[in-house]
Amino acid sequence: MFEIRRYTPDVAGEWNRFVAQSKNGTFLFDRGYMDYHSDRFQDYSLMFYADGRLLAVLPAHVAGDTLYTHKGLTYGGLVMSVGLTIVQTMTLFREMNDNLRAEGLHRVVYKAIPAIYHRLSAEEDLYALYHVCQAKVVARDYGTNIVLHAGLRWERVRRRGVVRARQAGVTVERSDDYAAFWQVLTDNLGTKYGVKPVHTLTEMQLLHSRFPENIVLYQAVRDGVVLGGIVLYVTPQVVHAQYSSATAEGKRLGVIDLLYDRIICHDYADYPYFDFGRSTAHADGSGLNEQLAFQKEGFGGRGICYDTYEWQL
C-alpha cells in the first residue's frame, strides 16, 4: 500500500535528493530544471511512499482530463529507488490509476525513460504498463546512439571532415558564452525549418547556470568567429547532443565533425553512451530524416527507439 502525495515546492529538496540517488533519474527531473517552464504546464507530479520511505516519483502535468509524463521533457516516466521491486511497482501503478480516476482523470500518456539512461536495469515500469495498465504504444521515435567502448570506425566522409577543419585552422573550445552559438542555431532552424530552438537563449543561460557540469557548450572557432557548436546534456550514463548547428562556412569546413571528434573520441570517451538524439520530423516519430540518420551512423551510431505509451483509466 502506497501513500501517494502531490509534489509541492516545499519538498523540492527531498525530490531532488531522491532523483540524484535513483536508479534511472537524470538532472532533467531535478526541480531546478523541470520548473524553468512551470508557467507552461499545470504540474501534477507524484511522490510514492511506503512505510514512510520515498520509493518513486513521477514527473507529470495535467491538461484537460489527461496526465502527461512529460510533454515538456525529452522523456518522462517513473523514477525509481534502487530497492523498488517489481511487485511493488505493479501495486504502485494499480493504486496510482485508482487515485487518478478518483481525481477525475481519464487518460495517461507516458514517455518512458530510454534504457541507456538507466544506471541500473529499470524496466519494471514497462512490465506494469502492459500487464496492469494495458497500455498501448502510441508513438515510437527513432534516435541514434554510440556504445562508446565498441569503438566502431567512423566513415571516411566524417574523418575527412575532421582533417579539413583542422587544416583550415578551426579550433574547438568549451565555452560558457551561449550567445554567439544561439544566433547560429536560431538562424539555421529558422531558415531550414521555420522554427525556433525549444529553449530561448535566456532559458539556456539560466539552465546552464543551475547545472554547469551537466549542460556544456563546445564551439568551433576560427579567427574569433564561431562557426558551429554543440550543446551537451551530460547524465551519469549518457552524453547527449541537445543542440548541434553550424554556419554555411562551418558546414563547408566540416566543423561538426571536428567537434564530435573532440567530444566523442577525447573528452567523453570513457562514458558508456553518446546519444545524438532523434532524427524524425513529427511527434509520433514518423518522418525519418534519412540524411540526418546517415550522418549520425557515420560516427558509429546505431538505432534506439523512444516509446510513448497511453492507457485509459
Q: What kind of feature is each model-predicted range?
A:
Residues 112-115, 278-279:
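Short, well-ordered beta-to-alpha junction loops that form the rim of enzyme active sites
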Residues 105-113:
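Divalent metal-dependent hydrolysis catalytic cores, especially in the metallo-beta-lactamase
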